[in-house]
Amino acid sequence: MGEIIDGKKLAKEIQEKVTSEVAELVKQGKKPGLAVVLVGDNQASRTYVRNKQKRTEEAGMKSVLIELPETVTEEKLLKVVEELNEDNTIHGILVQLPLPKHISEEKVIDAISFDKDVDGFHPVNVGNLFIGKDSFVPCTPAGIIELIKSTGTQIEGKRAVVIGRSNIVGKPVAQLLLNENATVTIAHSRTKDLPQVAKEADILVVATGLAKFVKKEYIKPGAIVIDVGMDRDENNKLCGDVDFDDVKEQAGFITPVPGGVGPMTITMLLANTLKAAKRIWKMN
């Protein structure tokens, strides 16, 4: 059976490093701060934001939550972002998506100062990622790279296939793998002979949003399989985009759902917030 990549354990190790670095900064009178803006009453977003707050505080950082009603105007939200851009105690700004339909997500993301864009969605940070310049990388893709490296595998020279082409996961993770000198293919719902394409991968990243979509015939024996999915199966049980039980014998390493990619996302957000603070303080 393939070796399980323990995302919880790795996330804890990275968070401990961040926490000890924050403690050193606090001794010097410097405290990194993360502000999260939550619009409306989406329960999933609320739970996720609460989790982010708890983890931010555990890391010794300042945590600010700004809650706005579903009916808030775009103008008011942009004003809130502008105030956070100018607030010297805040080093990371995150506007929880999705936003209500009457608000342009693009406008809001563009309004966040790219120095404080710890989600890595601002066009400047996206551009920096694509030219290989150090920047804020979206948290889930950053976590995926850490998970792959934790297996002790050298990414350079490997064939990587990413199934999924979203701006949040698929494209950035493909670019990060390219920056690590892998040979990368991006596949998606229109890709012909998808199982054959996937089976060439030494590293397979699956982000389709389709429960148990990837079966054993997609997997090269010994491949690293990273499952980004968070779905429900026919019994309403949490599962990923990879059929774990079908694939686990074939894979060399595999992330479980839950407990694989998920725990890494908030940890990388904390790492990005620390990085933002150090940049603003010119400590890098």
Swiss-Prot record:
<protein>
    <recommendedName>
        <fullName>Bifunctional protein FolD</fullName>
        <ecNumber>1.5.1.5</ecNumber>
        <ecNumber>3.5.4.9</ecNumber>
    </recommendedName>
</protein>
<dbReference type="GO" id="GO:0004488">
    <property type="term" value="F:methylenetetrahydrofolate dehydrogenase (NADP+) activity"/>
</dbReference>
<dbReference type="InterPro" id="IPR020630">
    <property type="entry name" value="THF_DH/CycHdrlase_cat_dom"/>
</dbReference>
<keyword id="KW-0028">Amino-acid biosynthesis</keyword>
<comment type="function">
    <text>Catalyzes the oxidation of 5,10-methylenetetrahydrofolate to 5,10-methenyltetrahydrofolate and then the hydrolysis of 5,10-methenyltetrahydrofolate to 10-formyltetrahydrofolate.</text>
</comment>
<dbReference type="Pfam" id="PF00763">
    <property type="entry name" value="THF_DHG_CYH"/>
</dbReference>
<dbReference type="GO" id="GO:0035999">
    <property type="term" value="P:tetrahydrofolate interconversion"/>
</dbReference>
<keyword id="KW-0560">Oxidoreductase</keyword>
<keyword id="KW-0511">Multifunctional enzyme</keyword>
<keyword id="KW-0378">Hydrolase</keyword>
<keyword id="KW-0554">One-carbon metabolism</keyword>
<dbReference type="InterPro" id="IPR046346">
    <property type="entry name" value="Aminoacid_DH-like_N_sf"/>
</dbReference>
<feature type="binding site">
    <location>
        <position position="189"/>
    </location>
    <ligand>
        <name>NADP(+)</name>
    </ligand>
</feature>
<dbReference type="Pfam" id="PF02882">
    <property type="entry name" value="THF_DHG_CYH_C"/>
</dbReference>
<dbReference type="InterPro" id="IPR036291">
    <property type="entry name" value="NAD(P)-bd_dom_sf"/>
</dbReference>
<dbReference type="InterPro" id="IPR020631">
    <property type="entry name" value="THF_DH/CycHdrlase_NAD-bd_dom"/>
</dbReference>
<feature type="binding site">
    <location>
        <begin position="164"/>
        <end position="166"/>
    </location>
    <ligand>
        <name>NADP(+)</name>
    </ligand>
</feature>
<dbReference type="GO" id="GO:0000105">
    <property type="term" value="P:L-histidine biosynthetic process"/>
</dbReference>
<keyword id="KW-0368">Histidine biosynthesis</keyword>
<keyword id="KW-0521">NADP</keyword>
<dbReference type="GO" id="GO:0009086">
    <property type="term" value="P:methionine biosynthetic process"/>
</dbReference>
<dbReference type="GO" id="GO:0004477">
    <property type="term" value="F:methenyltetrahydrofolate cyclohydrolase activity"/>
</dbReference>
<comment type="similarity">
    <text>Belongs to the tetrahydrofolate dehydrogenase/cyclohydrolase family.</text>
</comment>
<dbReference type="InterPro" id="IPR020867">
    <property type="entry name" value="THF_DH/CycHdrlase_CS"/>
</dbReference>
<dbReference type="GO" id="GO:0006164">
    <property type="term" value="P:purine nucleotide biosynthetic process"/>
</dbReference>
<keyword id="KW-0658">Purine biosynthesis</keyword>
<dbReference type="InterPro" id="IPR000672">
    <property type="entry name" value="THF_DH/CycHdrlase"/>
</dbReference>
<dbReference type="GO" id="GO:0005829">
    <property type="term" value="C:cytosol"/>
</dbReference>
<comment type="subunit">
    <text>Homodimer.</text>
</comment>
<comment type="pathway">
    <text>One-carbon metabolism; tetrahydrofolate interconversion.</text>
</comment>
<keyword id="KW-0486">Methionine biosynthesis</keyword>
